[in-house]
Structure formats: structure tokens, C-alpha cells
Amino acid sequence: MVCGSRGGMLLLPAGLLALAALCLLRVPGARAAACEPVRIPLCKSLPWNMTKMPNHLHHSTQANAILAIEQFEGLLGTHCSPDLLFFLCAMYAPICTIDFQHEPIKPCKSVCERARQGCEPILIKYRHSWPESLACEELPVYDRGVCISPEAIVTADGADFPMDSSNGNCRGASSERCKCKPVRATQKTYFRNNYNYVIRAKVKEIKTKCHDVTAVVEVKEILKASLVNIPRETVNLYTSSGCLCPPLNVNEEYLIMGYEDEERSRLLLVEGSIAEKWKDRLGKKVKRWDMKLRHLGLNTSDSSHSDSTQSQKPGRNSNSRQARN
């Protein structure tokens, strides 16, 4: 038996359909060599190791696919989206299973949309656009058809994919590839980025899994919160990436500004987030910035309400004059 996944992976596509341990079995009538080992270097860190050609972009061989996917190395280096590598590999080296040998499984539309949302602004900045060949519109929606997404992959025993320096499966998640673009905590940045949460926290642990890093922090103070509840205790900050950006050091105390995943009630520490060594002065600044931001929001709301009221007044005055006449 030749498995098309790493570590007994299970794929959970639309509805309640669960494909049992994605393995290529030798069955009567099955075409020989329908699945082949993934040989695309960028995709060897992902949790499947069997693919099928031609892929979704009509490359007949992996050699052709390697040449084509290499154009995205620069974009991947910006860490513009934690979903970009998964999406690209699902297109260029689609997962192959015994159940779906006749047609490679496509990535879900939502995965494409998240990757595009994060990375298209960078492409536009350099006068490029999101490739038509990677259009999201034609991809299947999770609850209406079979598709693959990071959330739909679990191990057979429920464990994550451990990162092991001696394990070639995790190449590409190496920290030496990580280049974090520093983001300074300024009022302009705070207003522009509209962070969901701001906390004072001490870093307790950095957990490194294959293609995923999580920071475990002890929350000391909550300066701003949104929809996800933040307890005054140890919480996880999820990167959904093999890189920890911004970088954190264990036992250091930071002011952290980031975003949230409302659907899964997670706090995110992703590209564009801020982590600066805690200083009381900085904490006071952030509180002032937040008050200004709230005040600006209230003024905008009051102004639009006032404009609406003013637009109604002439009508009422006109009616009253007509009544007097």
C-alpha cells in the first residue's frame, strides 16, 4: 500500500464526507501510476506526498509545473497570506487519492479568496494583477462539492504534523527562510491597520509545528478587544505560517497588536501585526490613539446623522409654511 498523505492524513471535504486514510491501493481496474510522488520542492512541506498530472493548470509533467510555480517564490517570500503556499500547491501539485484518481481535487474557493485578498495588493503595487489562471470564481465552495482546504486536513490520530529537522517533509518551513518586515507602533500605523486586539503579554513558549508556528503568551493587560474573548491567562497566538512575524523571544514582555479569526475564536499574529517590547509609555500612547480612533468614529457617525437630519429639515419647514399659508 502506498499512501498519498503524510502521517495518516484524513481529508474532510464537503458536508460529512470523510475519505478514509488517503492511500493509493492496488485495485483491479485502477490505472497504473495514476498517482505519483510530489517532486515540486516548494510543495514538499505540505501534508500530502502524492499528486497527479496533468494538474489544474494543464501542466503535463511536474518538471513543467516546477518551472511555472517558481515565479511565485518572491510573492511567497513576502508572507502576504498564510494560505498562498497551500493554494498554489493544491493547484500545481494537487492531492491524489484512490477515491479521486479520475480528477484531481481542487482547492476550495475560500482558500483562493484568502490568498488573493492578502497578496493581490502586493501584485498591484508592482503593476501586476492576480493571474487569470488562478481565478477563484470557478473553484468549488466547501459545502457544495469536494474540495481541499487547510482546515479540512487532520491526522488520523488528531495530532499535528511535528516539525523535525531530520524529517525532509518539513523543508520550506525552516526559520532561515523567514524574513519579517518590521512594523513600527505609530499612530498612523494604528489608525491605518485597525487592529482587532491589543494586549500586554509575556511570551511563555514558541511552539513550532510543520509549516505552523504558535506563540503561547500570558496576557497581563487587555488594551483593546473585539469579537474574540481574551481571557487574562495563557492564550495562543496563531500564525498559520512557518514563520513567526513579528518575532518574539521567550520570557520577554511585549505590546502586541494583531487580528482575529472570529469563526474559530482565535487571536492571530500575522504579517502586519506589531510586537514591541513593553514600556509603560508605549502602553499609554496606544490608549490615547485608541481614544482618538473611537472619537473619530463617533464624529463620523454624528456627522452623517446630522447631514441626514439637515436634509429632512427643509421638507418640514416647507410643510409648516404651507400650513400657515
Swiss-Prot record:
Domain FZ: 33-150
PROSITE patterns: FZ (PS50038), NTR (PS50189)
Signal peptide positions (record): 1-32
Disulfide-bonded cysteines: C35-C96, C43-C89, C80-C119, C108-C147, C112-C136
Subcellular location: Secreted
Skewed-composition ranges (Polar residues): 313-325
Gene Ontology BP annotations: canonical Wnt signaling pathway; cochlea morphogenesis; convergent extension involved in organogenesis; epithelial cell development; hepatocyte differentiation; negative regulation of canonical Wnt signaling pathway; negative regulation of cartilage development; negative regulation of cell development
Glycosylated position list: N49, N299
Superkingdom as given in the UniProt entry: Eukaryota
One Gene Ontology cellular component: extracellular space
Stated family: Belongs to the secreted frizzled-related protein (sFRP) family.
Oligomer and partners: Interacts with MYOC.
PANTHER family: FRIZZLED, SECRETED FRIZZLED-RELATED PROTEIN 3
Summary of the function given for this chain in its UniProt record: Soluble frizzled-related proteins (sFRPS) function as modulators of Wnt signaling through direct interaction with Wnts. They have a role in regulating cell growth and differentiation in specific cell types. SFRP3/FRZB appears to be involved in limb skeletogenesis. Antagonist of Wnt8 signaling. Regulates chondrocyte maturation and long bone development.
Protein's UniProt name: Secreted frizzled-related protein 3
Protein's gene: FRZB
